[in-house]
Amino acid sequence: MSIILRTGLLAWLMLFALNAAAADFTLKDTQGRIHHLTDYRGKWVLVNFWATWCAPCLDELPDLAALYKAHKGADLVVIGVAMEYPSAQVVLDFLKTQPLPYPVVLGDYKIAKQIGPVAALPTSYLFDQTGKLVSSQSGPVTRASVEAFIRSSKFF
């Protein structure tokens, strides 16, 4: 198979995967609440994978908090998924000193598998109002970049 054909096929498969509806995920946050993607129909859902030791992750947390606060109860939900922690207490202690306004899940790669691959931290997945995965990014995201993406979408 030629390189061009393989590259084209890979690009098509990635595009197909990105536009596929996500299977409903089940996430339990640190407050004991259960979150399903289907619970948020009609809203954009940003799932952000991060770690307490990850400097780029920590840098993006204030922007994600501002994004959540600006859209809380309206058109967008943020769910943080803490990854690669030595114990749950490390994350809980972090949240006591640096509380986040949005739900935080104690994650692992089994939980991540429900949403998508996490090859680096931070990684974010954005689902539209119908539950379709419309964007993913390895590396930090900003409030401005998420809002610009949503504004440019025909679904907003």
Tell what function each PLM region has.
Residues L58-Q98, Y109-A112:
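Structural microenvironment flanking redox-active thiols in thiol-disulfide oxidoreductases
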Residues A17-N19:
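N-terminal signal peptide c-region/cleavage motif recognized by signal peptidases
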Residues F25-V45, Y68-H71, I115:
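A short beta-strand-turn-helix
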Residues D93-P101, L106-R151:
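Thiol/disulfide oxidoreductase modules built on the thioredoxin-like
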Residues M1-L9:
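Bacterial N-terminal signal peptides that target proteins for export
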